[in-house]
Amino acid sequence: MNIAYKNATEAFEDLYGFIMGQGIYTNVGTKAVYNVGFYILNPEQRIITTEWRKFSEKYAEREFAWYMSGDRSVKNIKKYAPIWDKMHGGDNIVNSNYGWQWTRNHQLAKCIKQLKENKDTRQAWFTIFDGKEKDDYKYDTPCTLSVGFDIKPGIETLDMCVTMRSNDLVYGFCNDQYCWTKLQQLVADELGVPIGTYYHFAHDLHIYKRHFDMQEKYYKQQLKNL
């Protein structure tokens, strides 16, 4: 695998091949690689254009708008992605509305304030995973651990670093990077600096068994349609 990618599509395609070729079969129906870090040089190129992935920008925008609302209820978002209906205990309330997480204790606002007051700060971080709440994670354990910002010295661009405990490449990463880089752009605009590099670290980066032949199935269908 590479470490630096031009855009999200290049990252997705290379990582898909790397996991399928070098990943380890797990006991939970995935192939996984561990402690993977890479970066995307042009995070504003966040739309996955790989034909067989069939990325939905419309859904990604809905998910980001849901995060921005800070509403923990999945009553509406689950209409577009049924997986959300499996992540609550019957009350439609989840922990993985990241906007709810970053507004608690004004975490994101404090990051922006710190960067405005001191562009060299190393403290502009907010956390998503909260160890004090692990007993509440029965149905929905947040995949993202923390998010940090840096204004790169000399270049004066805003970098973002996202750390994740677990990351499904096909759906998780594709939508996650879309939403996180949208937030990166919003923060950069608030600070009056250009968007910089997006850094992504995943402890467990994986592909589910049902997606092992995703690429092959797509091209077989294309041949049938000729």
In which residue ranges do the predicted regions lie?
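Terminal, non-catalytic protein-protein interaction segments that mediate quaternary/complex assembly
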Residues: M1-L226
